[in-house]
Amino acid sequence: MHLASLFAQRVDASLRFAFPDAPSPALVEETLRLAGLLHDVGHGPFGHFFDQEVLSAWGIDHEVIGRRLVAGELADVICSLRASPSARFEPGEQIDPMWVAWVMADTDIEGYRPPPWLRALKPILCGPATVDNLDYVPRDAYMCGISLGAIDVRRIIHYTFVSGDTIVLHAHATGALEMFLASRLYMYLQVYHHRAGRRFDLSMREIFRETVVELLPGNPLDHAGEYMRLNDWSLFDAVQRWEDEPPGSKRRRLAEQWARIIARDLPWYLAYETIPRRDADLGDAQERITRAVAGSAGDVRIEVDIATARVAPHNPMTESGMVNIYDPLTGTVEHARTAELVSRLPQHNQVVRVFTDSPQMLRAVHDAAASVLQS
């Protein structure tokens, strides 16, 4: 929320020059603050893992649920606000919950047309350097004891302004943006997709959906109350209580499997890890590795896990996929400068790891994976 305030205050003058009918600075600021606060309100237990393993069955994700909550259950609270930390709104002003719902996620909302001033501000919430990732990357690095290169958040904010109908970054800040993207990539590869975390993901995947079925009666859009009460801690509390269920029952079995995971008694072992070539065909990698090791492996299970880090996600507000760069030498917004900046960084970096449930077969699986993935 604090970074949203800093962005709002910094771009205010240029926003009003481009959109004279924009609402008061306080209302714009609080709209962005709420979007920063609530953009992940739709997450279930274990964040994006819940999206992949549970919500995908209904064709939705946490952003769909978050927008539903903002426009529904939270709408009255949002409409009741009359000030930001900086100032009170103008008389008669209030935040439209749909503004918050629209600006906090990438995709458009069918049938909804946001005001032009809000559309211009969307890259502050959805882009390569947002109030979200500018906050969590340095914070997570600090909490994990990782020393990143300098992340000059204030420089990025200082050189951000509205030009035409979108957010623009002055060329003087391209170095700061590039350093931030490099730090973000490092965190994804070394922390968010760490091999230990992926072992936990594989282990939980075997029981996660089955566990959630016991706690959530159906689609969260139809059971908002139950969904809002479901979080990491309520799940842990439930599976701990299931240890008292009768032996042999489904809940007792799930409780015992969760107990092993919590104790780090994980059934998956890392056998091989590589960053593949950009042109590598990974579509049938698991099948090829399984065939290569089948002669000596017996009944061993193999999982090929592809962890992906996108450092420049598609930004629907610009054709280039990145923030537009203002070139002071020409006085124009240069899309070519954006392409030049992006070309310096991996656009789609992958780490491929091969896991097996047999510690005795680690070497055989390693050699098979190497022969397949390096060929």
Predicted regions, residues:
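Sequence-structural signature of the catalytic-core scaffold of metal-dependent phosphohydrolases
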Residues: M1-L34, G42-A263, A271-E273
